[in-house]
Amino acid sequence: MTTATKQTVETLAQEYCEKITEANAEWRKQVRINGVKEDGYKCKLWFDEDGNYTGEKNAPYWTYIIGRKYLKGVAMEWKDDAQYGRINAAPAGYQASTVHAFIDKKTGDVFLPASWNAPAKGARFNLFQNKEALFEGVMNRPHGGYLYR
């Protein structure tokens, strides 16, 4: 594998993670706004005094972890267990919480995760061949439903 191909796969994987982050942030915003429409309660964590949506203080984001064969697309969530008085709590900060997808470093194939360590069999998408369909799926269903057959 050439360096150009490796960088291309990693660049597309980064773009894929950015799309997931963007789509998920929009989904979370719509859920909160629709909740206000239903019950009229505006939580001070997400809305200012004027009723405008402000977003989250430590919103989750998606990135990838480089492995031997795959790039692992993971959700990073803010954890601060020490604030709840837990003994031996991990320091506050972002930690990987769930695997969203696996991306083959050589071919650019996108796989559904079977577990934290391994992908399911059968590629769902290819970052090079049908990138537009993949990104459209991300924008419509940011939690990974587009990866199921």
Task: Give the ranges of each region predicted by the language model.
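Exposed beta-strand-loop-beta-strand "reactive/processing" segments of non-cytosolic proteins
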Residues: 55-101
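C-terminal partner/receptor-binding element of secreted or periplasmic proteins
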Residues: 129-149
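Negatively charged, low-complexity tracts enriched in Asp/Glu with abundant Ser/Thr
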Residues: 2-68, 75-76
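A short, surface-exposed interaction/processing loop segment used at functional sites
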Residues: 107-136
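Intrinsically disordered, low-complexity segments enriched in small/polar residues
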Residues: 33, 38, 53, 120, ...
